[in-house]
C-alpha cells in the first residue's frame, strides 16, 4: 500500500479544469439530492446509484458470513493455508500484485476503448455465475474454482459502476451528491444485505457453531450465495435502462 501511494504521488495528476463548487445554504445543500427535480434532471446518475445499491446489497448478503462459512461449513482452516506460505510463495507475491495492477490498468483501457455497454453486462454475468456456482460447491477446493468468476466479476463490476457514477456526477455539484451516494453505497446495502443473508442461513442452516463470544450461532449455508445471485440479477434492470438511454453519454446531467 505504501509503495502504491508513493507511485501515485508522482504518477497521478488531478484535473485542473474542473468547475469549483459554489458556496450555498447548508440546509438546501443537505436536501439537494432528495429533490424530485434533481432526481429527474440527473436520472442516469440515480439509475447508477440504484445499480450499485443492488450490487452492494448482493455482496452484503454473503460477505459478512464468508469467513465463518469457509471455516465452519467447508472445514477450511486458515492455519493450513499458512502452511503453504513458503519462501518461493513470498518471492512470487510481489509479481502477482504487479500482474493484478497491470490487469486493472488494461481493464481500464479496455473500458475506454469499447465503452461500458458490453463490459458492464459481462461483469454482471461473471459475478452472478460465480455466485450461482458457489451455492453448489460444498468443499473448499471446489469453492475456490467458483470464487474465480465470482471475485473477478465483483472487481470488474465495482470498477464499472463506480466509474459510471463518477461520469454522471455534475462537476460543480460533486459534494452535494455525497450524502445521497452514501445512502445507496453503504446504508441500504449494509442493512438489507445482511438481513437477507441472516434469514437464509437461519432457514437452511445445517447446524450451529460456538462463536468467540461463547454463544451458539447458525452455520452460514451455501444458499446465501444463491440469494445473493438473485439480488445480483436485479442489477440488470437499471443497467438495461441506462443502456437504452445511452450508458456512454451524460447528456441529461444538469449543471
Across the structure, where does each feature detected by a protein language model lie?
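C-terminal membrane-cytosol helix-exit motif in multi-pass small-molecule transporters
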Residues: 1-18, 238-243
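Intracellular juxtamembrane helix-capping segments at the cytosolic ends
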Residues: 156-170
Amino acid at each position: 500500500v505504501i509503495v502504491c501511494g508513493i507511485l501515485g504521488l508522482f504518477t497521478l495528476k488531478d484535473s485542473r479544469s474542473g468547475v469549483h463548487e459554489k458556496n450555498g445554504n447548508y440546509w438546501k445543500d443537505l436536501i439537494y439530492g432528495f429533490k424530485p427535480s434533481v432526481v429527474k434532471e440527473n436520472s442516469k446518475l440515480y439509475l447508477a446509484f440504484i445499480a450499485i445499491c443492488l450490487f452492494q446489497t448482493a455482496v452484503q448478503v454473503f460477505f459478512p458470513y464468508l469467513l465463518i462459512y469457509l471455516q465452519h461449513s467447508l472445514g477450511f482452516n486458515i492455519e493450513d493455508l499458512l502452511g503453504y506460505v513458503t519462501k518461493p510463495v513470498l518471492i512470487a507475491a510481489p509479481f502477482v500484485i504487479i500482474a493484478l495492477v497491470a490487469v486493472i490498468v488494461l481493464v481500464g483501457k479496455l473500458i475506454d476503448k469499447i465503452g461500458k455497454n458490453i463490459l458492464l453486462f459481462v461483469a454482471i454475468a461473471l459475478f452472478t455465475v460465480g455466485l450461482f456456482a458457489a451455492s453448489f460447491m460444498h468443499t473448499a477446493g471446489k469453492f475456490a474454482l467458483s470464487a474465480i468468476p465470482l471475485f473477478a466479476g465483483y472487481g470488474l463490476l465495482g470498477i464499472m459502476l463506480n466509474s459510471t457514477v463518477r461520469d454522471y456526477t455534475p462537476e460543480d455539484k460533486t459534494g452535494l451528491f455525497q450524502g445521497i451516494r452514501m445512502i445507496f453505497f453503504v446504508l441500504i446495502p449494509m442493512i438489507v444485505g445482511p438481513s437477507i443473508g441472516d434469514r437464509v442461513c437461519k432457514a437452511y442452516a445445517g447446524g450451529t457453531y460456538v462463536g468467540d463470544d461463547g454463544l451458539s450461532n447458525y452455520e452460514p449455508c451455501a444458499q446465501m450465495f444463491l440469494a445473493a445471485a438473485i439480488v445480483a440479477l436485479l442489477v440488470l434492470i437499471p443497467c438495461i435502462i441506462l443502456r437504452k438511454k445511452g450508458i456512454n453519454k451524460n447528456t441529461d446531467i444538469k449543471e
